[in-house]
Amino acid sequence: MNQKQDNHGNNNHRDDNIDINSSIMFNNKNNVWVDDVMVSRCYNCKKKFSMLRRKHHCRNCGNIFCYNCANKFIVIPNFINDRPEPADYWNISYYITSLKDEAERVCDNCYYKVKEKTANSEKIANILKNPGSIVDISKLSVSYSDIKDHYYNHLRNIQYYLPNHVYSQIDKKIILANAKYFSKHSKYLVHLIKAIDWNTIKITDDKFDSPSVSIYKNRSQHKQKFLDHICEIIENPKKVSCQDLLCTRTCQEQLSFDDCINILYSKVQELPDSLLQYLFAIIELTPDDIIKNHAVLFVNIIKNNSNIFLEKLLYELLTKSEDMIYYIYWLLVISKEKADYQDITNIQRFIELLDKQLVVKMDREYRFYAGLIKHLNDPKDYLENIFDICDEISLPYNPSIKLTGVYTDQIRIKNSYTRPVIIAFETNVGRIDILFKKESVMNDLIVMNLISLCDVIIKENIGLELGIVVYPIMPLTNNFGMIEIIKNAETIHSIINQKKTVFQHIIDKNENKVISDIMKTYMYSLVSYTLHSYFIGLGDRHLENIMITDNGEIFHIDFGFILGTDAFPLTLTSDIKLNSGMLDVIGGRGSDRYKIYLDLCAKGVIILRKYFNMFFILLSQNSNYKINHIENFIMSRFQPRQHDTVVISELMTIIEKSHDAYTGIIRDFLHYHNQEKTLQNGMTKVLKEAYDVVKSFTNST
């Protein structure tokens, strides 16, 4: 998590004397090429693409144009450093680029901009060698308009850097030149704190207009004086307006919880104790459920931490309730599996701070689940008499619920690849069915945390209950986990097997309720279903991992494939599973409810895309995905530098293409026959018959 990487996810060994020319920025809105499947019209002339009007990527801005609007070629200099990368290898244009000579295809707008940037590159480089503040730059004459625009764009774009960004020397110079104006501008304060190498203070102190700093020859005095000045900037009143400082719409006067988490993500091990205390004072004000949704991050911090003061802050934050202590303890125990000696020492030191009697109890209960895992292939014998000889067992994700017995005659083994087991337990609150999976559920846990946070964010911003369905998930080891099964819910596959439509099923389950209320519940949940699909990139969507509650709430299960990955990548399906059966419930395409559904999806996009840092941080806690994969997905899906209308348009295109897409039908076919082994058996039969034919032909000759 703390490994420094550049914005392509690679280890960064940037030379401090980097050539200024290599930092000329173009103010591109895209970080990766726009995905082909998200666009149906030319970015410029808006004409619809067809078999005759084909798509062409501009190699400079990454947008998609028709031939007429992107038919210019120019050499794009290497010093333009914010060119978007191909989103993935499915873009045909990715391969065509390598067939071109030095001149590359660009749109009309980029053609003239590249020429202008090339002509002014030397002037820009001279300014960036020792950049002044935004106030100084604004005083330059009209003849410097391109240079001013470049400076403004660079400063503005700093606010969109991902949490893993490694700051160039030019980034640092521009940040420090403007530091005195950052008071009460939260997003700039985040990057001011993150741009400083707190271990060495390798920065130009005079940028702070504080000459007295240089007289402190003693390193600790120097560092303290420097820290005091940063604290002054944080606490000082606002000096310039958001408009004058080119702030984003998410700028606030005080750092938020998300801002603090962003700073901790990459700087937690080197921040001075006073800054840590300041950040944790803000984090302490956050509701427990949000803290719990970030528990995986805090556990990773504990695992890598050797700072006793930070350990104290973490202990105070994470031990406010027995529920939180249980949750953190279990995640810590699991994290030992992939830890070195120092990490295990750090984890154990934190556990020793907990109440000793409670630790003994949690350890005993952990051993119960560890024993169950060993016997999952045939759990009946293990569970038959276990509750006669041991005390009640707490659920790790909710210790107030105690397992008191088990329905051994109702244990079911599911017919899927890893053969997960469903066990029905007696508890102090009634029967609970738990699915034990023989694979990692860390993806599921992180996705469920994000879904829960999305619910909170939507409520806070528009006061709307979208009927998001969440359910407890708990890793037991790195290769096993437990998921509590939602009561009174069925998969769409099960509903269709009953010869019912989704609409009929919901009506049958709600005979005594007002139909319009039921339809509204379903519509709201369909909005959340759509937004989760889009912003998390849920893959492997088929009718057996989409469920509907008896109340009419539709929701996802099984998050083994996220970030646009899929079990059947060759189907090239869209990121959202929608069919006519799902849409008929709200009246189908063209209905009033369908229009409201689209409008709510658009509002959700505007709200959730502001939280791209939160998504990046939580998704990066799962080691199954490389950082550059997560980064490319976040930048292509959230597009933080783009206008809302562009991202909304792309989502609407996906929704439109999702209606009964043939690839979705193929996916359901492949999933069903893979589960039933009919496809495998059929192929075996075909191969056997082919072999018999060849054999008989050989014998006859």
From Swiss-Prot:
Molecular-function GO term, any one: 1-phosphatidylinositol-3-kinase activity
Segments for region (Activation loop): 556-579
Gene Ontology biological-process annotations: endocytosis; phosphatidylinositol-mediated signaling
Class in the EC hierarchy, top level: transferase
Chain segments carrying region Catalytic loop: 537-545
Keyword Zinc-finger: yes
Enzyme Commission number, as recorded: 2.7.1.-
Binding locations of Zn(2+) 1: 42, 45, 66, 69
SUPFAM superfamilies, per the entry: FYVE/PHD zinc finger (SSF57903), Protein kinase-like (PK-like) (SSF56112)
Region (G-loop): 413-419
Xref: PROSITE patterns: PI3_4_KINASE_3, ZF_FYVE
Start and end residues, zinc fingers (FYVE-type): 36-115
Source organism, top-level taxon: Viruses
Domain (PI3K/PI4K catalytic): residue spans on this chain: 407-677
Keywords: Kinase, Metal-binding, Transferase, Zinc, Zinc-finger
Residues where Zn(2+) 2 binds: 58, 61, 107, 110
Gene3D superfamilies: Phosphatidylinositol 3-/4-kinase, catalytic domain, Phosphatidylinositol 3-kinase Catalytic Subunit, Chain A, domain 4, Zinc/RING finger domain, C3HC4 (zinc finger)
Cited Pfam families: FYVE, PI3_PI4_kinase
Keyword Transport appears in the UniProt entry: no
GO cellular component, one term: phosphatidylinositol 3-kinase complex, class III, type II
InterPro entries: Kinase-like_dom_sf, PI3/4_kinase_cat_dom, PI3/4_kinase_cat_sf, PI_Kinase, Znf_FYVE, Znf_FYVE-rel, Znf_FYVE_PHD, Znf_RING/FYVE/PHD
Family affiliation: Belongs to the PI3/PI4-kinase family.
UniProt protein name: Putative phosphatidylinositol kinase L615
Source organism per UniProt: Acanthamoeba polyphaga mimivirus (APMV)
